[in-house]
Amino acid sequence: MEERLSVFGCLACMQPNPMLQTLSSIATLALGVAMVFGAPVPDGSWPESKGSVSYEEVYTIKAGEVFDGKMKTYDRTNITCHGQEESGNSTAVFLLEPGATLKNAIIGKNQMEGVHCDESDCTIENVWWEDVCEDALSIKGGTASSVSKVIGGGARYADDKIIQHNGLGTVVIDGFFAQDFGKLYRSCGNCKSNPRQRFLNVSNLLLDLKIIQAQRVDPNVSIVMMNENFGDQAVLHNIHVKPSTENYTECASSMGTNISGSRPVILSNGPKNPVCQYSYDDVIIVLDNEQTQAQKQH
């Protein structure tokens, strides 16, 4: 969680990083490869649970393993949500090793950290978070060529972030439904391991911004937030938005820092190359079952 402190003491974060420039071509290639997915846009419905499973400790999905949850609800026996309190993977439901896949599962409310992919290169397919706690999915570690994928599924009631990306490489989010949330994706803005360059491709999303029960840490929604000074790049395509009365932006850029607990300064909202790559033709506003192209910043 990013607290509200000044970032201007981090002079090193404002300087160009030669390593990031070197890794940029590798990660850009990974981003291009990741863009081949094409999931359908969600219809806004939530799946019915086929049963329940509670774990006493985090369940590890090994490298190369595919865990099919068969649409049951998974949570923890001894963990309850404590809002935006950070705790680590010991309070998650699932921990995925590189190359692991979690699919067809519902993550219940009795947990704190949802799903962890602590070395990147994992696949999350048709996974649903019924009530997000601190984060739904945390992606860490990896290399510049790492690609982690979130295909289908959905999440709701996130006070802040749904997907937190602290590691390296690319994240792909395709065909995802998010409801009542603060941010769908955040490239970590205050990790001690920064500066790290991160890449994002999001497409075929349905985003319902109406406040239902989330206690948002920021009243204004940023669907994705990237760190411009670290060379982050996001590509957005076919984004369907059901707006609420609060302000929102599809993509915000910030000045990232490596000061834990600081709050990065927002630099811009809306399309801006290369950090926020999209046009308003890529955004479809859904009002009373009618769809219109977005024409201006919100």
Regions found by a protein language model. Give the residues of each.
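Fungal secretory targeting signals
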Residues: 1-40
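Poly-acidic low-complexity segments
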Residues: 2, 20-22, 113, 134-135, ...
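Non-catalytic surface loops within mature trypsin-like serine protease
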Residues: 31-33, 98, 141
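Extracellular beta-rich repeat passengers
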Residues: 41-55, 59, 66, 71-86, ...
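LRR N-terminal entry segment and analogous cap-like coil->beta motifs
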Residues: 65-67, 71-72, 77-79, 88-92, ...
